[in-house]
Amino acid sequence: YAKHGKKYLATKTRRPSGVMRFAKKVTLHYQPLGVVGLITPWNGPVALAANPLAQALMAGNAVVHKPSEVTPFSAVLLQEICEKAGLPKDLYQVVQGDGATGAALLDAGVDKISFTGSVATGRKVGEACGRNLIPCTLELGGKDAMIVCADADLERAADGAVRGSFFNTGHYCCGTERVYVPDSIYEPFVDKVVEMTKPLTQAASGASDVGAVFWDKQMDIIEDHMRDAREKGAQVLVGGERNRSLSGYYFPPTVVTDVDHTMDLMRRETFGPIVAIQKVRDEDEALELANDSDYGLSGNVWTQDLEKGARIGAKMVTGSVSVNDIAVTYGVAEAPFGGVKESGVGQVNGEVGIRGYCHVHPVIVDTTKKAQGGYPYTEESADGLRKMVRTVFGNKFLRRLFV
């Protein structure tokens, strides 16, 4: 944004279309909204705050930030970084507290809210913003689907499933939570995933591949979803039970097959280190099931035919799609990021994202040398207007030219 922000927010001059093109000039000014309220979650507490913070500040706003009450020092760190970088002290302020503090921020007279968190809380935030008639960006939950095509590079796709599901212990809104694989490659794909998962390590200290579950609330959800899946016929090939050899909340890297859409594991956000693989007839069924979700944050398609991957991705009802990669959209600053359905409202990143922290203020200048008619109406002026309408809209060539 330091490199491209000025270009994104530069004043733009436009010529109107239609009959106005010879009489008016439009100038678009991107004005700061004022004060942005920023509410951020416990997973990725620095990254998920720094991104909207940078965009709001670069657009000329002040920011009041309410971090999660269970990761308060992340915001303190961000504030220190901003002050060391030369940001005026009061331009970015942090308020600590729980949900009541967040609710107070919503009604404190801010000009926009940027919220990242759960669907349930996001609904409350959206309702408050509607009541206060202020815009909001809501980045909510996800249940990202991975579609593995029959021609996919199995080694690469299996690695994508493992990385996408286990990254940050699954505590990632764009983490892969559902994997759909055609029958023709199902067994070798599952074998590859199992082979890659078994050597992964988990430890309370030192180097390890998968860390701890953040807290007891998330552990309860993970265990509930696994219990429900087992009761409905799912097969656990690796892991599947809480790692009680370690003190704390540890759930091992887990691979589950024979899953379906009757299970919470395939319907609700799990937010844990689980690869859940469902067998499908073909890519068409995979796409149908991928779209059979209340969520629509992002997704990914794996194939050696990049054009086919793009075609399938374009049919996924999600905010964004990656081909032969996982969860990359948030890291591509030029690509707008946001969800559809219950995954959110609005977008961050890119030109669209930074302009979302502005009011687009058009100034329209009349470029003619005399008044364009007015009171009192006369038969002559009315006749002139009728002739103009007939001339422009009654002639196909002129209609194409002016309309």
Predicted features and spans:
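Long amphipathic alpha-helix in the N-terminal Rossmann-like dinucleotide-binding domain
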Residues: 1-10, 22-23
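Rossmann-like NAD(P) dinucleotide-binding subdomain of oxidoreductase/dehydrogenase enzymes
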Residues: 14-156, 280, 397
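Structural detector of well-ordered beta-strand residues that form the stable sheet scaffold
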Residues: 57, 64, 93, 135-137, ...
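Residue-level signal for inorganic ion chemistry
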Residues: 60, 92, 113, 142, ...
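Short glycine-enriched loop/turn motifs at secondary-structure junctions
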Residues: 106-107, 140-142, 172-174, 207, ...
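ALDH superfamily catalytic-core signature
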Residues: 120-260, 323, 394-402
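Conserved C-terminal structural/oligomerization subdomain of aldehyde/semialdehyde dehydrogenase
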Residues: 243, 250-403
